[in-house]
Structures are given as structure tokens and as C-alpha cells.
Amino acid sequence: MSASPPPSAGAAPPAVRVGVLLPRLPEEPADWLAECAAYDSAGADALWLDGGPDPAHDVLALAAALAAATGRARLVVALPDSVPQAALLARALATVVLLSGGRLALAADSRRCAELGAVAPTVPAFRRLAPAGPGYEEPGAGRWTPAAAPAGPDAWRTALAGAAERGVHGLVVPAGQRLLEALRLGVSAERHTRPNRPTRARVTTERQTTRRSS
């Protein structure tokens, strides 16, 4: 094989690309993402994500977060050695839980909810009610039911009030301009509470207060 010809006189040498070996994900993922975004904005050619042979977090989930936080650098992910599928899923879920600040929940049918509970017991799983009925059941909270997009603020208030009266915990509404406008107007921020029966402790307290005042 012939050698590459030497660069012509006066030609600039080829630029050396810079890859940044990222630190391990700390307890404050927002700071980590901000640091990664800073390297990207500063001109790094690649962000190198290597969690070692047995990483504490799922590197592909971290790469997804990096893809949203950065815009130009190549994302180089060192995949760990093969591990059981359940362990991969548990690690991925734990990573998203950390990145989201604990906001992650799952949705599945009853059988799948049981499986997910064994893999990730700290992640709540919304149980799909069909064919028993539309919507989902949130553990420890209540039922989420589908609802149509609001025709306007008044219709949205009526829908929220009706859901509260029926004991519905939440509504699942298709994305759209009407819903966006209702949310921007703060209509959904109005307090729509479900009727609750007084608890035994509350009844006892009320009776004690009445006796003291009499």
C-alpha cells in the first residue's frame, strides 16, 4: 500500500477531534446534563459514555437524555457485557426514575403489572381496566378515564367537575390546541375535589371539639 502523500506546503494540519469521557451520573442528574450540554456547546466532537462492565444506570437511557440535552456532539456509548433481560429493564427503569426525579410510572394490563412489580417494585404501574372498562387504575389513588378534547373553557370546567363528582382521579385527554389553550388559561388548575367521607379519626376529633366547646 502506498503511503499517503504529504500535505502540501502551507496546508493546515487536520483538526484533532475531541471526545469527552463523561463522569458517572451523580445524585443530581440536572447538574450532570448541564455539564454535558456545556461540553457540547463548547465544541466537543464526541461525548463518551462508559459506565464500566457493570454500570449502576442504563447507558442507553442516559444516551437518550443526552440526545435531548445536546445538539451537535457525537454520542459514543460503551455497552456493558450481556446481562439478563430483567436486569436490563430494572436498570433502565431506575435510570429514568433518577433522571425524572421520581416522576416515572408505567401502564400495562394486570399480568404485566405483576411482572413489572417484581422487576421494579418502586415504580407505580397503572393497571389497564379494559375489558372491564376504559381507562386505568392508579395504585393507591384511583381511576383515570379517557375524555374528549374540551370544546372550550366552560366545557372543560364541566368535564372536570363531572369527573370529580364521579370519583374519577384523572382524565386522559388527546393532545390538541383546545386542550393546550385550556391548560394555558389555568382552567385545569381550579380545585375539583372528589367527595370524601370523613375518616374515623376526623369524626372523633370533631366530636372532641364539640364537647370542649359545649
Regions inferred by a protein language model and the residue ranges of each:
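Short, acidic/polar
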Residues: 26-39, 88-95, 152-163
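N-terminal beta1-alpha1-beta2 module of alpha/beta enzyme domains
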Residues: 1-70, 115-119, 175, 210
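C-terminal helical cap(s) of enzyme catalytic domains, especially alpha/beta-barrels
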Residues: 112-120, 177-214
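Substrate-binding cleft of secreted/luminal carbohydrate-active enzymes
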Residues: 163-185
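Internal, glycine-rich beta/alpha segment that forms the wall or movable "lid"
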Residues: 2-14, 85-150, 155-157
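Hydrophobic residues within beta-strands of alpha/beta enzymes
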Residues: 47, 75, 104-106, 171-174
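Structural motif corresponding to the early beta-alpha repeats
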Residues: 74-85
